[in-house]
Amino acid sequence: TIFPSGRGKDPELQITDEQFRGLLDFIVRMRETKKIHASFSCEGFLGEYEGKVRDHYYTCQAGLSIASVLCDGSISACTSIRSDYHQGNIYKDDFWEVWENKFEPYRNREWMKKDECADCKVWKFCKGNGMHLRDSDGKLKLCNYKKLYK
């Protein structure tokens, strides 16, 4: 797995650093041949792979240009983030009010610049990775940049 959530958190299901690089190399090759339109998701900054494995450079758009209403009515900045990051419920809260006033943690990510991100040389490109890669304490669960460039 690439995204360590749910059953994917099991270390037995995690891909190795070598497999991860192989996956990205495969995506690059497929995009060059144009036989398959392969694209890597918003799983964080990828260094030299940026511009080669997806149609845009990495940004986490959760709360910036993306908001979601989930099946239970929860208002979330992204369907992939943890429920403790939800900012309201459509049955109780005004969506526009939530969008305008409660998504600040997504728009100002300085709170993420801690632990392994505190002194990261690519912070200005990464901004702490995707919100879905944070645990309930805000700690980063996975850094794909580190996975590639240890």
Descriptions of predicted regions:
Residues 80-150:
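Flexible mid-to-C-terminal extensions adjoining Fe-S/redox cofactors in radical SAM and related proteins
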Residues 1-76, 80-86:
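Radical SAM enzyme [4Fe-4S]-AdoMet core and its adjacent flexible, acidic
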